[in-house]
From Swiss-Prot:
One of its GO terms (cellular component) is ribonuclease H2 complex. GO terms for molecular function: manganese ion binding; RNA binding; RNA-DNA hybrid ribonuclease activity. It catalyses: Endonucleolytic cleavage to 5'-phosphomonoester. PANTHER family: RIBONUCLEASE H2 SUBUNIT A, RIBONUCLEASE HII. Endonuclease that specifically degrades the RNA of RNA-DNA hybrids. This is Ribonuclease HII. The lineage of its organism: Bacteria, Pseudomonadati, Pseudomonadota, Gammaproteobacteria, Aeromonadales. Residues 9-196 form the RNase H type-2 domain. PROSITE patterns: RNASE_H_2.
Amino acid sequence: MMIDIPEDKLVAGVDEVGRGPLVGDVVTAAVILDPANPITGLADSKKLSEKKRLALFDEIKQKALAWAIGRASPEEIDELNILHATMLAMQRAVAGLSITPELVFIDGNRCPSLPMEARAVVKGDSLVAAISAASILAKVTRDAEMTELDSRHPEYGFARHKGYPTPEHLAILAERGPLPAYRKSFKPVRHALGIE
């Protein structure tokens, strides 16, 4: 069940992917959908098959009025903490839009500081079509980055666990130690570095 969107306002949806992983950027996306060019099948990216996500990824980029990716690096995550780095990445995604929205719906329970009206929507990736679209862009983008990292470091298994702290990943991290792309403020990485 999608929530009603004001028809007289230019609305963007924003979502993030990658708060939990031990490695890589936190990736966000902002999307302004075109009401005259609807996209069927939008849903929370985590509930879609990879094949469906990839098809929707291309369709969203073609049909949206505007879209942008924002990110915060592992260094920024370590410096700011993951919550503040996520807010920064969301600000960057909104600032990257080629059209300025009048209203921004953010997935979750808090909004970054933005120069326009913003509303937090819990479970927004299932309730607001533009947030669903943003979740798909962010997830496909981040998954592709993990696959690329996997091609450079296949022994770490990034294509399988996408950087999340699975038992397999934690065992590899303990054995091989962290790469530069790891988030050094995250406890399992600190442990692998011998900091705690």
